[in-house]
């Protein structure tokens, strides 16, 4: 009898912890529980009820949401919605302003998250993975007529309100067709209601858009975390192992001892000198189908004016008198081949050449030809 009471107490405690989010657990407690690798009882019906994969034919407006939204969602979920629309149409996703999942760990959505993927015949592009409570995910427009939404929660802590995503056709809106509800109000169609939202362009991850996204990262570690949050450390290590004879060829000029008198004279007479200049690699190399990290590099380029304050100085231009090419080692991507797991073959360290101006001359139209 005592054994039965003990088992009932454990089951009750485990089930109630799924709903209680009033207290914020300490990070140490979280790690301890995760390391213990505790599992829910397989007899718990929620485990089977919420492990689903559903295909939705998008003919109008509707939504998908986490179970029990806007309350705490259950644990141990793996839900997938595959949205399909007619050919020559696209699908728009808009997140409800009430959004909250378990917080990220080290800025990585590792445990509870919602993920959106663009699906085509040739590739799958992850549009984003979100968790936490800080901000609502952006509006998303699919590249094709297919898009996939995945929601995952682990065996431990849950949060509320979860999420709700409204979907709609971008073109040729038709009256919403009724769809079957497969589980506990997780999926629903909005019948007789026109769901309109502002037309905001959501750039897909083509080269130009990815180039802008890369601008948000300060380190290559942050960049790899974005592409592969689960395997970025392995990608970072393999980046150098893939090159059998890795040898960086980047170099910089040696600087001679500064001559203050000469600098002062140059400022008065010829401020046309090589100086640091930031160039966008894609623009500099005229490559439109690849992106680089870092996006920009410092080079020496001629700048300033000529003979500032002297006669005819406005008619002079500062041009390169000697140009050399220098090697720079960067990380190169081909966006169409980026994969979620593992490092794509088209992501590699490469050497590029950029022009550096070593000497600058003033060319003045008033000066007679030499």
UniProtKB/Swiss-Prot annotation:
Signal peptide, first to last residue: 1-18
GO cellular component: extracellular space; membrane
Annotated positions for site Cleavage: 247-250
InterPro entries: CUB_dom, Cystine-knot_cytokine, PDGF/VEGF_dom, Sperma_CUB_dom_sf
Annotated keywords: Cleavage on pair of basic residues, Developmental protein, Disulfide bond, Glycoprotein, Growth factor, Mitogen, Secreted, Signal
Keyword Glycoprotein found: yes
Modification after translation, per record: Activated by proteolytic cleavage. Proteolytic removal of the N-terminal CUB domain releasing the core domain is necessary for unmasking the receptor-binding epitopes of the core domain. Cleavage after Arg-247 or Arg-249 by urokinase plasminogen activator gives rise to the active form.
Highest taxon above the source species: Eukaryota
Cysteines paired by S-S bonds: 109-131, 302-360, 306-362
Domain CUB residue range list: 52-170
GO terms assigned for molecular function: growth factor activity; platelet-derived growth factor receptor binding
Subunit structure and binding partners: Homodimer; disulfide-linked. Interacts with PDGFRB homodimers, and with heterodimers formed by PDGFRA and PDGFRB.
Official protein name in the record: Platelet-derived growth factor D
Organism from which the protein derives: Pongo abelii (Sumatran orangutan)
């Amino acid at each position: 009898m005592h054994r039965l009471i003990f088992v009932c107490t454990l089951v009750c405690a485990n089930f109630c912890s799924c709903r209680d989010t009033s207290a914020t657990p300490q990070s140490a407690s979280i790690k301890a529980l995760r390391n213990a690798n505790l599992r829910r009882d397989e007899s718990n019906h929620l485990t089977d009820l919420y492990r689903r994969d559903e295909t939705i034919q998008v003919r109008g407006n509707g939504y998908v949401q986490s179970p029990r939204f806007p309350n705490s969602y259950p644990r141990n979920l793996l839900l997938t919605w595959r949205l399909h629309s007619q050919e020559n149409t696209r699908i728009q996703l808009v997140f409800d302003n009430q959004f909250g999942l378990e917080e990220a760990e080290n800025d990585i959505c590792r445990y509870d998250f919602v993920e959106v993927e663009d699906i085509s015949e040739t590739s799958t592009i992850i549009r984003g993975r979100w968790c936490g409570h800080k901000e609502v995910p952006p509006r998303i427009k699919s590249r094709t007529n297919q898009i996939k939404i995945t929601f995952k929660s682990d065996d431990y802590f849950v949060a509320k309100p979860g999420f709700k995503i409204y979907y709609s056709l971008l073109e040729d809106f038709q009256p919403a067709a009724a769809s079957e509800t497969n589980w506990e109000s997780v999926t629903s169609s909005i019948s007789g209601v026109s769901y309109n939202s502002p037309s905001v362009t959501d750039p897909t991850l083509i080269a130009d858009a990815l180039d802008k996204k890369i601008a948000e990262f300060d380190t290559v570690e942050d960049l790899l975390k974005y592409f592969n949050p689960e395997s970025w450390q392995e990608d970072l290590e393999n980046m150098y192992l893939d090159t059998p004879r890795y040898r960086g060829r980047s170099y910089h000029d040696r600087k001679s001892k500064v001559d203050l008198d000469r600098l002062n004279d140059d400022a008065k007479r010829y401020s046309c000198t090589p100086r640091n200049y930031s160039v966008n690699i894609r623009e500099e190399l005229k490559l439109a189908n690849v992106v680089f990290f870092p996006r920009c590099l410092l080079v020496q380029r001629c700048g300033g004016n000529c003979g500032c304050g002297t006669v005819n100085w406005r008619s002079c231009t500062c041009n390169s008198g000697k140009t050399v090419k220098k090697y720079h080692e960067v990380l190169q991507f081909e966006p169409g081949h980026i994969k979620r797991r593992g490092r794509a073959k088209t992501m590699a360290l490469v050497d590029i050449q950029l022009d550096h101006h070593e000497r600058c001359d003033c060319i003045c139209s008033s000066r007679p030809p030499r």
